[in-house]
From Swiss-Prot:
Entry-linked HAMAP family: Ribosomal_uS5_B (MF_01307_B)
InterPro entries: Ribosomal_Su5_D2-typ_SF (IPR020568), Ribosomal_uS5 (IPR000851), Ribosomal_uS5_bac-type (IPR005712), Ribosomal_uS5_C (IPR005324), Ribosomal_uS5_N (IPR013810), Ribosomal_uS5_N_CS (IPR018192), Ribsml_uS5_D2-typ_fold_subgr (IPR014721)
Protein name, entry field: Small ribosomal subunit protein uS5
Domain S5 DRBM, residue spans: 22-85
GO annotation, biological process: translation
Domain-related comment: The N-terminal domain interacts with the head of the 30S subunit; the C-terminal domain interacts with the body and contacts protein S4. The interaction surface between S4 and S5 is involved in control of translational fidelity.
Chain's role: With S4 and S12 plays an important role in translational accuracy. Located at the back of the 30S subunit body where it stabilizes the conformation of the head with respect to the body.
One cellular component (GO) term of this entry: small ribosomal subunit
The keyword RNA-binding is assigned to this record: yes
GO MF assignments: rRNA binding; structural constituent of ribosome
PANTHER family named among the record's database cross-references: MITOCHONDRIAL RIBOSOMAL PROTEIN S5
Natural source organism: Rhizobium meliloti (strain 1021) (Ensifer meliloti)
Keywords: Ribonucleoprotein, Ribosomal protein, RNA-binding, rRNA-binding
């Protein structure tokens, strides 16, 4: 009975294959200073968004003395903290949602095919890594990238699949979809 070692070559190759499915975007990088007895010690803080472009996305924050190390730490943190977001037709959100974090507020709206990603800065990175192709987003309040990303994730966590909404309301999914079609909204799954 041969047991595999923890850091075996196969394990490393499997991890690299799993990581290759993710797309990462650097959202922000800051130079930070720690004041010590002899002066200031400089370091870097990075904010990274990671996603598989199929509905899973996460963000991470990493700090280190060198930029590449901070980015690596942030990327690892993002991969550990992924969330799943249901997408309509694999291209847009199911319904409009609000999110907030601190003084930052965001409004995310589903859009028709061909609209594209109409969103600024940090929110665009989240949607590109998530796999959303058509969305309209508006941010108000804080323009701090950390707050905007966290507010966007708050909104995405509130996103529900129509099947879940139907179950919550105690009605059939087909009834909910027929109401959607009769309201003039194109039905896509």
């Amino acid at each position: 009975m041969a047991q595999e070692r923890r850091g075996s070559r196969e394990d490393r190759q499997n991890r690299e294959e799993r990581d290759s499915e993710f797309v990462d975007k650097l959202v922000a990088i800051n130079r930070v200073a720690k004041v010590v007895k002899g002066g200031r010690r400089f370091g870097f803080a990075a904010l990274v968004v990671v996603g598989d472009q199929k509905g899973r996305v996460g963000f991470g924050h990493g700090k280190a003395r060198e930029v590449p190390e901070a980015i690596r730490k942030a990327t690892e943190a993002a991969k550990r903290d992924l969330i799943f977001v249901p997408l309509r037709g694999g291209r847009t959100l199911h319904h409009d949602v609000h999110g907030r974090h601190g003084a930052g507020k965001v409004l995310l709206r589903s859009a028709k095919p061909g609209t594209g990603i109409i969103a600024g800065g940090p929110m665009r990175a989240v949607f590109e890594t998530l796999g959303v192709h058509d969305v309209v987003a508006k941010s108000t309040g804080s323009s701090n990238p950390y707050n905007m990303v966290r507010a966007t994730f708050d909104a995405l966590k509130n996103q529900m699949h129509p099947k879940d909404i139907a179950a919550q309301r105690g009605m059939k999914y087909a009834t909910l979809q027929s109401r959607r079609v009769s309201a003039g909204v194109a039905s896509e799954e």
